[in-house]
Design a protein with these regions (language model features):
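Cofactor-binding active-site loop characterized by glycine-rich and histidine/acidic residues
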Residues: 1-65
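Glycine/aspartate-rich loop-and-adjacent alpha/beta segment that forms the canonical ThDP
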Residues: 131-190
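Hydrophobic faces of well-ordered beta-strands that scaffold small-molecule active sites
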Residues: 191-196, 220-222, 251-255, 273-277, ...
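Conserved anion-binding
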Residues: 204, 262-263, 272-360, 415
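Catalytic cores of alpha/beta
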Residues: 209, 259-269, 308-322, 367-385
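Glycine-rich, proline-tolerant flexible connector loops at the mouths of alpha/beta enzymes
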Residues: 220-237, 277-281, 330-338, 389, ...
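C-terminal helical cap(s) of enzyme catalytic domains, especially alpha/beta-barrels
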Residues: 294, 378, 392-421
Length: 422
């Protein structure tokens, strides 16, 4: 069964691919209004049925009757029954070739949101793989009065499963039961490539962000240095706020600053998706304050340690809240350093320790990561990889990100084969 089924808890109606689900939901929302009920209707539609007229008739109806007790999700993964939507009937713009890399994350090329706005809808566009963005979008939609709301969630179909990811051939198909355990292992070992833009042209960081977009980076790593905690100085929250409209790629803000508790709110307001502070400038009390601020604002929580620092004992009180732990493999604040080899053993030890304490986030390897050592970093337990001059400093950023990803995939295949034999 390729479509949501009534056997799935919470699903009350299955519209299939004919686009009638939105009309059904509007009927429910109007009935709730007539009956004086305050419940809310949630509807998920795909981009395939958004090529059809039924959806747009319903869109006009929802705007006419100001249906604000309904939230619609558009799963914008660019794939429909026959191929990519942008090749069959473009919702954004026509796709030439098969490479969606740039269009997927380049906000300047998106037209779908404008179409819904022209029909009188409140439109919220998000990265559909960030639970924090989903939660925040639902809250904003629920607060909107007098307009129907749609959350356009940019997603990658089959994300994390190598043979399914961004593959139209897997539309409406379920995997065979015998390969499900492998798929589960793949999902448990998803990874992210995070280029650090300070390795590029500091006078034109907009260009560096666009290179990351074109290369289909998973995160954009933002190294904030204040000249006090580390000797160098880069940029602050004002620059992050300027860059934020360029893309929905999550901003991974690494604050190498003194007294971060005094400044974190500025980086939240600037649009950071994940904010990491250093254990060296926190104690249990200040980190608790930071956690509260980040958690209440739907921002990922990160803690970083320098090469000569171990995780402090107080951090284990927050371990179930942590989204990421950065283990520095170079001395922060200096560029062009080589990876400190002892970091491999340190990462393996910390990964084991965190797992025993029920850590459900991921470890990020930061500093000197390159094509030669990224596979070993993955095998150590890291799942996010910051690349500075090894990515941004290269002539073809798109190709080098692809090569980074291929190296990790090769290591992951080896681990999966070993586990299967064990």
């Amino acid at each position: 069964q390729g479509h949501p089924d009534l056997k799935c808890p919470g699903v009350e109606f299955c519209g299939g691919s004919l686009g009638i689900g939105l009309s059904y939901s509007i009927g429910n929302a109007l009935a709730a209004r007539i009956d004086g009920k305050d419940h809310r209707i949630y509807t998920i539609i795909g981009d395939g049925e958004s090529d059809e007229g039924q959806v747009w008739e319903a869109a006009m109806t929802a705007a006419k009757y100001k249906i604000d007790n309904m939230t619609v999700f558009l799963d914008r993964n660019f794939i429909q029954q026959d191929s990519y939507t942008e090749k069959i009937m473009p919702l954004d713009e026509e796709l030439l070739g098969d490479d969606l890399s740039e269009m997927w994350k380049d906000a300047s090329r998106w037209k779908t949101g404008d179409k819904w706005r022209s029909f009188g809808w409140n439109v919220i566009e998000i990265d559909g793989h960030r639970i924090e963005q989903i939660s925040d979008a639902i809250r904003r939609a629920n607060q909107t009065k007098g307009l129907p709301s749609i959350i356009i969630a940019r997603t990658i179909k089959g994300k994390g499963v190598e043979h399914m990811e961004d593959n139209p051939q897997w539309h409406g198909k379920a995997p065979k039961p015998e390969i499900v355990p492998i798929i589960e292992d793949e999902l448990e070992s998803q990874f992210m490539i995070a280029p650090s833009i300070i390795a590029g042209d500091m006078s034109n960081l907009e260009k560096e962000v666009k290179q990351c977009v074109a290369g289909r980076a998973d995160y954009i790593h933002l190294d904030v240095m204040d000249g006090q905690f580390v000797p160098n100085k880069t940029f602050d929250h004002t620059k992050i706020k300027e860059l934020r409209p360029l893309t929905l790629i999550p901003f991974d803000a690494h604050l190498m600053i003194d007294e971060p508790v005094k400044h974190v709110s500025n980086y939240i307001d600037a649009g950071s998706d994940i904010i990491t502070v250093h254990a060296e400038v926190c104690d249990e009390s200040t980190f608790g304050e930071i956690c509260d601020m980040l958690h209440s604002n739907e921002v990922g929580i990160g803690l970083a340690i320098n090469p000569d620092t171990e995780l402090p004992q107080w951090c284990y009180k927050f371990v179930e809240l942590l989204d990421q732990v950065i283990i520095m493999s170079v001395v922060p604040g200096k560029s062009g350093q080589k990876f400190i080899e002892s970091t491999h053993e340190k990462t393996r030890r910390i990964a084991k320790d965190l797992k025993e304490h029920k850590f459900e986030g991921y470890i990020e390897a930061d500093g000197g990561v390159n094509l030669e050592n990224i596979g070993a970093c993955f095998e150590d337990g890291a799942r996010a990889f910051v690349g500075g001059s090894a990515i941004i400093g290269q002539s073809d950023v798109r190709m080098i990100i692809k090569e980074f990803r291929n190296q990790v995939l090769e290591s992951r295949r080896r681990l999966l084969i070993k586990k299967a034999h064990d």
